[in-house]
Amino acid sequence: MVVDDSAVVRQVVSSVLKSDSEIEVCGAVADPLFAMTRMRMQWPDVIVLDIEMPRMDGISFLKKIMAERPTPVVICSTLTEKGADTTMQAISAGAVEIITKPKVGLKGFLHDSAKVLINAVKAASRANLKPLQRAMASNLKVTPKLSADAVLAEGNTSRLKTTEQLVAIGTSTGGTQALELVLKALPRVSPGIVIVQHMPEKFTAAFAERLDSLCEISVKEAKHKMRVLPGQALIAPGGKHMLLKRSGAQYYVEVIDGPLVSRHRPSVDVLFRSVAQSASGNALGIIMTGMGDDGVKGMLEMRRAGAVTLAQDEASCVVYGMPKEAVKCGAVERSLSLSEIPQAILDCSH
């Protein structure tokens, strides 16, 4: 079901989705109140939802859906700072995917982004919201124990010695909520973390700011040449690749342009390959919930370089895609539930 107050958006989004034989559009309505009436007759598998609408805003509607009958929701948001902030509220309320729409040139943009829209809806249709709801209800806490070629060529791992531990995380669909749960559970004294979360540009800054306000550790959108420090997580900006580099015993990141890798920018494969080359055995790699196979090859390179490699298990994933492919190809040493990941991060620094 498509819920958007713009008749143009409803028409174009419906047309794009109907062009895929695997997708049936059961309705396109102008606001949440119309949607609720239609949904009493036929409940959709996925909802494509605008968040700025008359009569009832998308956030209120989303919270109502999640309370009554949890359903995968794809947010269709404008590329503005206000849109990004509101979208983060929607992600917090349970939305699993984000697609963007400009304020001008809307019709052409949506047609050009047809594949992105179709893939987002298909990923959402595979989402299993129950594990995430259980994890959010349990409010993860950890008590620390006291005792890719187009962007980065394959090469030898660094032989320089450093004892500084580093964590690299890659995730996609369902990852925003999963990352929030993991990072909130970490104490201030934690290893440095670098993260790729598939997300459009302009949204990662708002995502990092939200996490920073919720977590004991510092969370920032990565900037070029920014150092990776203990007690801090850096999130790759949307639309850019992030690579880990090392100068002596210190890690820093490069934020660069480049082609789509594994259909994404930022790409988990690019980050993981750079971690294999710069941190090798001092790294912990974690691949979490998401559709597709981005990060699989990079994680295999990390494991071959001596890093510890972990995957989120099927039972706790919203979409068991990326972790499944990583396990299948032998890139993963162990699979852990979402609730076990924070402790694994702390263990790597001891």
Swiss-Prot record:
Posttranslational modification, per the record? Phosphorylated by CheA. Phosphorylation of the N-terminal regulatory domain activates the methylesterase activity.
Occurrences of domain CheB-type methylesterase (ranges): 160-350
State the reactions this protein catalyses: [protein]-L-glutamate 5-O-methyl ester + H2O = L-glutamyl-[protein] + methanol + H(+); L-glutaminyl-[protein] + H2O = L-glutamyl-[protein] + NH4(+)
Q: Catalytic positions?
A: S172, H198, D294
Name the Pfam families on file.
CheB_methylest, Response_reg
Q: What is its EC number?
A: 3.1.1.61, 3.5.1.44
Record has Phosphoprotein as a keyword: yes
Q: Which residues carry this modification: 4-aspartylphosphate?
A: D50
- Keyword check for Ribonucleoprotein: no
| Response regulatory domain boundaries | 1-116
Reading the lineage from the top rank, the first entry is Bacteria
Biological process per Gene Ontology, one example term: chemotaxis
Cite a GO CC annotation: cytoplasm
Provide the leader sequence positions. none
Question: What would you give as a GO molecular function for this chain, any one?
Answer: phosphorelay response regulator activity
What family does the entry list?
Answer: Belongs to the CheB family.
The role this protein plays is: Involved in chemotaxis. Part of a chemotaxis signal transduction system that modulates chemotaxis in response to various stimuli. Catalyzes the demethylation of specific methylglutamate residues introduced into the chemoreceptors (methyl-accepting chemotaxis proteins or MCP) by CheR. Also mediates the irreversible deamidation of specific glutamine residues to glutamic acid.
User: What protein name does the entry list?
Assistant: Protein-glutamate methylesterase/protein-glutamine glutaminase 1
- Tell me which species this is from: Photobacterium profundum (strain SS9)
Source lineage: Bacteria, Pseudomonadati, Pseudomonadota, Gammaproteobacteria, Vibrionales
